[in-house]
């Protein structure tokens, strides 16, 4: 699970971005049609966790793991991630891209146990919500 602070307010409270992305030899990512040679599907689920008149805190879950997938999805939504000037953000008040992995899990390669790590949202203090991700 990821959390992002985005500029503006999405039109809907939740949604899914399903798109096709392609990388060039310089690792730049573009949104393309599914028939474009080398394109890969990208599926991003999101929901608004909190918002004010300027920014929204978005919870994000991905089905695929494409380079810049979340950044491209938020840009297409019309709400670029705060600090992500490459993908359309007009603001960078924290001198960083406000995208953070709040929960990561994987099967341990030696024990085969499922291991999960969680962390606080470093920019959640923008709101009056707890900085722990909701479960």
What do these predicted regions represent?
Residues 1-135:
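RNA pseudouridine synthases
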